[in-house]
Amino acid sequence: MARKAMVVKQQRKQKYATREYTRCTICGRPHSVLKKFGICRICFRELAYKGQIPGVRKASW
């Protein structure tokens, strides 16, 4: 879990655009965040298996 201080720090508007980075809105994880959904791969997988993300299906070919 992300520390509360880091989550609050990330939410503030940065002085320079290059300092901004994505963070998972559910768990606060800073790495492997899917920009389209705003959540990390781990949370995405859990929600997709539960069917809580509309339009996402398990791939089969």
Curated annotation (Swiss-Prot):
Binding note for cofactor: Binds 1 zinc ion per subunit.
GO cellular component terms listed in the entry, alphabetical order: cytoplasm; small ribosomal subunit
Any one GO molecular function term: structural constituent of ribosome
Keywords tagged on the record: Metal-binding, Ribonucleoprotein, Ribosomal protein, RNA-binding, rRNA-binding, Zinc
Cofactors that this protein relies on: Zn(2+)
Gene Ontology biological process: translation
DNA-binding recorded as keyword: no
Annotated Pfam families: Ribosomal_S14
Residues that coordinate or bind Zn(2+): 24, 27, 40, 43
Family: Belongs to the universal ribosomal protein uS14 family. Zinc-binding uS14 subfamily.
HAMAP family per record: Ribosomal_uS14_2_B
Subunit organization: Part of the 30S ribosomal subunit. Contacts proteins S3 and S10.
Stated role: Binds 16S rRNA, required for the assembly of 30S particles and may also be responsible for determining the conformation of the 16S rRNA at the A site.
Protein name: Small ribosomal subunit protein uS14
